[in-house]
């Protein structure tokens, strides 16, 4: 079992604070905010698959935005009333990493949701590296693109 210090060393201070203590990276500073390469996004802590570039869009909010997870079962939703707001927190299912929040102001044609996710909680796996990195089963997501 990885200790907190080992995890912090492996993923970095910001990713640790975001995933383990529900911190939020500053808007427009994350690596994946204005990033639209073909591939998948996984939990930086556990490597579990979360989102696809096919469902990513530019919401202008300053954080990566997705219309949905690859499969709904991959994330869990939790009520969040911190900072005097009522929001829905999104966590990874296996590791329980804080990812961000989901809002109901996303593109109507894509289901109306906006998963506003911290770049620091994610690791991007480029399409051409998915098989090598152990994510070959998800290559079929891109068959029709």
From Swiss-Prot:
Superkingdom to which the source organism belongs: Bacteria
One GO location term (cellular component): cytoplasm
Domain MsrB stretches: 4-127
Active site: 116
Reactions catalysed, as given in the entry: L-methionyl-[protein] + [thioredoxin]-disulfide + H2O = L-methionyl-(R)-S-oxide-[protein] + [thioredoxin]-dithiol
GO biological process terms, semicolon-separated: protein repair; response to oxidative stress
Top-level EC class: oxidoreductase
A Pfam family per the record: SelR
InterPro entries on file: Met_Sox_Rdtase_MsrB, Met_Sox_Rdtase_MsrB_dom, Mss4-like_sf
Coiled-coil stretches noted in the UniProt entry, renumbered to this chain: none
Molecular function terms, GO-annotated: peptide-methionine (R)-S-oxide reductase activity
HAMAP family for the chain: MsrB
Family: Belongs to the MsrB Met sulfoxide reductase family.
Protein name, entry field: Peptide methionine sulfoxide reductase MsrB
Protein source organism: Streptococcus pyogenes serotype M3 (strain ATCC BAA-595 / MGAS315)
Lineage, highest ranks first: Bacteria, Bacillati, Bacillota, Bacilli, Lactobacillales
């Amino acid at each position: 079992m990885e200790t907190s210090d080992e995890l912090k060393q492996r993923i970095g201070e910001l990713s640790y604070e975001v995933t383990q203590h529900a911190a939020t990276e500053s808007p427009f500073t994350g690596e994946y905010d204005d990033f639209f390469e073909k591939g998948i996004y996984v939990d930086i802590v556990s490597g579990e698959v979360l989102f696809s570039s096919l469902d990513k869009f530019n919401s202008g909010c300053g954080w990566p935005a997705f219309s949905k997870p690859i499969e709904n079962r991959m994330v869990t939703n939790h009520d969040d009333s911190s900072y005097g707001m009522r929001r829905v927190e999104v966590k990874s299912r296996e590791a329980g990493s804080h990812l961000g929040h989901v809002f109901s102001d996303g593109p109507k044609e894509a289901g109306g949701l906006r998963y506003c996710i911290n770049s620091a909680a994610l690791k991007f796996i480029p399409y051409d590296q998915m098989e090598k990195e152990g994510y070959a089963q998800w290559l079929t997501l891109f068959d029709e693109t």
